[in-house]
Amino acid sequence: MTVDSHHHLWDPAQGEYPWMTGRFAPLRREYTAGDLIPELTAHGVRATVVVQVRADVRETEELLALTTRHPFLAGVVGWVDLTSARVDRQLEALRTGYAGQRLVGVRHDVSSEPDPGWLLRADVQRGLAAVAEAGLAFDLEVTPRELAAAAQVAAAHPDLRFVLDHLGKPPVAAGGSALWRRGLAGLAARGNVWCKLSGLVTEADWARWTDAGLAPYLAEAAARFGPDRLLFGSDWPVCTLAASYGQVLAAVRRGLPPQDLDKIFWRNASAAYRLDLGALVAAGTTRSARGGSDD
């Protein structure tokens, strides 16, 4: 069984995606659940976690609504304004709203904030406490420069489950960095942090990456987090800039010990996000997904 813990769905006609320029311009098109389903079917992926892209609660509401039409969407990592004095009310509205039971986490693009210590701000700390109180996870979208602050925040919120996206975005194309390795080690020392094995192909040379070139980063994450705190994520459709869905999945599989794959490819996602996978498996998610609407 496989769970994809990180992918996106979007429609540029419905919101702003200012980063879809230059090399990322090919992504400026609609990507629907219907587009993803053939990939899931071809590769035996039974369930997924769809992750926000826009800093807009409306996108989170739209993603939650999609889960009612596509049962393979086991969870939504959405967005709320962590700096708002009303963040607890925003979370409550989402959790008690339409399909709110599928909200499993919150994410904010910390890497886009000018201040590398943004996570340490008092208002953000209050917001993270509200996320913990709501029983949700928090996805860390950070680069190596923010890893030290992320480790401090994880230590300050031991009851909050943190999930590091894309291994903290190591500069694979440049051959890695000591800053990334130090930061990853510090964050991994916190037992309430999981790490997604995702996004590596787009941190590498898009045209020349190889499994062997990614292997040291997978090995570093495995050494730091161990088999119980690693999750597979495709980062579809962003990954398609450099690789197919199947290539991404295969690269991660080949870079890990076979005895750990069961945990990394579904059990850990269930633990980190508290996914209700039993119901999904019983329903036959992939078959149900093929019968859903193409949106």
Segments predicted by a language model, with ranges:
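Mid-to-C-terminal alpha-helical segments outside catalytic/metal-binding sites
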Residues: 1-3, 26-47, 220, 224-231, ...
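Conserved, mostly hydrophobic/aromatic
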Residues: 6, 48, 63, 76, ...
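Active-site environment of divalent metal-dependent phosphoester hydrolases
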Residues: 10-12, 55-58, 83-86, 111-114, ...
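Divalent metal-dependent hydrolysis catalytic cores, especially in the metallo-beta-lactamase
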Residues: 22-29, 34-55, 73-81, 104-111, ...
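Short, electropositive alpha-helical surface patch
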Residues: 58-74, 158-164, 214-223, 245-256
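Active-site gating/metal-coordination segments in enzymes
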Residues: 60-145, 152, 196-200, 208
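Catalytic pocket-lining loop regions of alpha/beta-barrel enzymes
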Residues: 118-231
